[in-house]
């Protein structure tokens, strides 16, 4: 008897090709499932759930597969969006995509897969592992690899997941979509955070977190060099949007004192205080047993390079990460993912004291 695979379909080209490839294999009963996590946007928003669902309908019709829709809007706001706002208000820089994968796609969506009597869940993520029992590894396309975003998802939650695109390059996926005549073949990839769309981040955040004007201080001179509308609008290492003139070198956000509502900056992109030799990580998720010390590499943000490091477990359940070479703009609240080669060992949330606290 054929097993049933539920394809998480977003209306984009990646999930469309996943459904196409699985249907073409002839080994599965393929069922599409569209997940709505966010309502329609206002006049400046770009998160177009209705248009995306129409594309899912078109692909399902082309492939002659059944499809369903499920709304997790309420749960998304409670488990992802509310935390996103809370973390920003407290001075952190969270990653909602990592949260969404852990809390929604590979938790609530998995429960829906069981309801539909699915044997597997297939997604368009560019990574490898899952149902093959190997945990999680990078996708072979270095420009599209998404293992970073899944590093916080428990291994058990991936045990029935298929990643058909993990061994493919994006150019190949586009080519397959075009040759198959899929309706989404030329559709642009979605970018950014779904609930923000193309709006400037500050204009979005100020709808939910009130402005709180304060001083911008040069950390080296302790002189006030400007004013800000809220320390929560800034992230460590940020250069743009400071509105500070008259400086010989560009200014970068070094630290934030949320209690005193101060943003500290330094001048020059290579200022030594912008670099950290170590960090702490909490809310850890491991795909392999943690050894002491674990010699590996770490990625402190999605597009950052791997940095060689040693990971030491601490008694309180966190880990200390010591880098071989100091790393720039280590940001509290961001996700850190650990690797050995292409294998993702796990991940956690960065917890590092601000410079002014040291």
Swiss-Prot record:
Keyword Signal attributed: no
The enzyme's E.C. designation: 2.8.1.13
NADP among keywords: no
Example GO BP: tRNA wobble position uridine thiolation
Segments of this protein annotated with the region Interaction with target base in tRNA: 95-97
InterPro entries the UniProt entry points to: MnmA-like (IPR004506), MnmA-like_C (IPR046885), MnmA-like_central (IPR046884), MnmA-like_central_sf (IPR023382), Rossmann-like_a/b/a_fold (IPR014729)
Alphabetically ordered keywords of this record: ATP-binding, Cytoplasm, Disulfide bond, Nucleotide-binding, RNA-binding, Transferase, tRNA processing, tRNA-binding
Region ranges (Interaction with tRNA): 144-146, 301-302
Residues given in the record as ATP binding sites: 8-15, 35, 124
Cysteine disulfide links: 100-194
Cellular compartments annotated: Cytoplasm
Active site: 100 (nucleophile), 194 (cysteine persulfide intermediate)
GO cellular component: a single term: cytoplasm
First-tier enzyme category under EC: transferase
Site positions per UniProt: Interaction with tRNA: 125, 334
A molecular function (GO) term: tRNA binding
Catalyzed reactions per annotation: S-sulfanyl-L-cysteinyl-[protein] + uridine(34) in tRNA + AH2 + ATP = 2-thiouridine(34) in tRNA + L-cysteinyl-[protein] + A + AMP + diphosphate + H(+)
Family: Belongs to the MnmA/TRMU family.
Function recorded in the entry: Catalyzes the 2-thiolation of uridine at the wobble position (U34) of tRNA, leading to the formation of s(2)U34.
Name recorded for this polypeptide: tRNA-specific 2-thiouridylase MnmA
